[in-house]
């Protein structure tokens, strides 16, 4: 399954980000806790080499808590500050202010030595499409100051948001790389909804999800759909269609409808708390 998505405006956004980096002290990078590495932009590490870094594991409530902790440790080992959040219900938000101060303590001390008082920390909020940047800013700032939507690429333009006397946020459009070198990355991003569904083969996507769940979360499909997990992936999809009565007008099983239902129930968390990539895979190379 070949997945690619890189609209032209993303190239412009990357150039804009390079300019904006000159203005900021800290990069706050949102990743999806279900796919923390795949939902990172590989350009950000290179572009932000000399900046303080904070990674927010967003939608942590939808992810496997054991893996949340493992990913937190993974990134901390690599020099990042890390906070688990859910920008929709505000979970973890109170922690962020203190972590921002901690991440920028060298900048604050440098200002103090120069006699500069009360200069706010300027932070860039970055992340790939549909990872929850605008919702995070709305929740963090306490008002709907950034346009939100659940379709990739909805956030446009540049906005400075003054949170308080200590912190100003710059919202930037998410950036997705031009080509997925590893097709597993594209697959994972497609499953969490960071790539437009119109350009995807939903049936193939569902089969790949079933294959992963059978291996890493045995029993989860049986519990939800009363199917036998020893079956092949396509047979399991058939069983899900039967369980949920996904039938065409002609009376046949509607595999595409069942596939869409499975993916939707994964994305919404109805299937259970699932993380699609685990840090031990990265440690093992």
Residue ranges and their predicted role:
Residues 122-142, 146, 172:
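Glycine-rich phosphate-binding P-loop
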Residues 87, 137, 167-170:
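Conserved active-site beta-strand-loop modules that form the wall/rim of enzyme catalytic pockets
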Residues 61-126, 145:
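Canonical P-loop GTPase G-domain recognition
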């Amino acid at each position: 399954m070949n997945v690619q998505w890189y609209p032209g405006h993303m190239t412009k956004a990357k150039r804009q980000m390079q300019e904006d980096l000159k203005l900021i002290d800290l990069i706050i990078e949102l990743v999806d806790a279900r796919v923390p590495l795949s939902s990172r932009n590989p350009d950000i590490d290179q572009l932000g080499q000399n900046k303080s870094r904070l990674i927010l594991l967003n939608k942590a409530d939808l992810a496997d808590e054991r893996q949340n902790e493992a990913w937190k440790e993974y990134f901390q080992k690599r020099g990042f500050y890390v906070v688990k959040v859910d920008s929709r219900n505000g979970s973890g938000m109170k922690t962020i202010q203190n972590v921002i101060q901690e991440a920028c303590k060298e900048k604050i001390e440098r200002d103090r030595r120069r006699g500069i008082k009360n200069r706010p920390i300027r932070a860039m909020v970055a992340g790939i499409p549909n990872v929850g940047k605008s919702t995070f800013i709305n929740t963090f700032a306490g008002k709907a100051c950034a346009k939100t939507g659940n379709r990739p690429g909805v956030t446009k333009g540049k906005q400075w948001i003054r949170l308080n006397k200590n912190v100003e946020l710059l919202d930037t459009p998410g950036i997705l790389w031009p080509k997925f070198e590893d097709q597993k990355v594209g697959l994972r991003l497609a499953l969490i909804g960071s790539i437009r569904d119109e350009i995807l083969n939903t049936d193939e996507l569902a089969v790949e999800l079933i294959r992963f769940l059978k291996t890493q979360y045995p029993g989860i499909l049986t519990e939800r759909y009363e199917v036998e997990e020893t079956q092949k992936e396509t047979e399991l999809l058939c069983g899900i269609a039967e369980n949920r009565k996904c039938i065409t007008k002609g009376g046949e099983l509607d595999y595409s409808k069942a596939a869409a239902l499975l993916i939707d129930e994964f994305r919404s968390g109805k299937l259970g708390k699932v993380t699609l990539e685990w840090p031990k895979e990265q440690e093992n190379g």
